[in-house]
Amino acid sequence: MVSRSLLILFVGFSFFVTAQVKWMSFDEALTAQKTSPRNIIVDVYTTWCGPCKMLDKNTFGNAEVSAFINENFYPVKFNAEGNSKVNFNGNVFENPKYDPSRQGRNARHQFTVYLGITGYPTVAFFDENANYL
């Protein structure tokens, strides 16, 4: 009886683990594209954005959606107000006005500005040659 319960728990946990999008950084996606070309999907979000959280839970948290994304794209989760560096098309994009004490009220990241994104959430796509679509 205990072994059956453990098996059910293990299978349920395995399903939960596989039902998540395997997010990476934009630089990691560009590196992966060099050896195995795939399109890139970028979830551009902010920490204060309610619809961003709903997108995570209801869409990216869906087992079928996450499996499709993991199999067909390099998925990137990008904080539009974060402080990560992005190397793209010979440019280094940063957020020079980032202030950790202003969590949820930071300036837009240069990469977000470069892409022309002004609202969140935004899902951006790049083809397998890293061209912004």
Question: Where are the regions a protein language model picked out?
Answer:
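Short, flexible loop segments at the rims of nucleotide/cofactor-binding pockets, characterized by
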Residues: 19-20, 54, 98-103
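Short active-site neighborhood of thiol/selenol oxidoreductases, capturing the structured segment around
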Residues: 36-53, 75
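Thioredoxin-like thiol-disulfide oxidoreductase module
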Residues: 26-31, 63-133
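A structural micro-motif
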Residues: 19-21, 39, 73
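Detector for the c-type heme attachment site
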Residues: 53-57, 126
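Bacterial Sec-dependent N-terminal signal peptides
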Residues: 1-22
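N-terminal "domain-start" segment that seeds a small globular fold
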Residues: 17-35
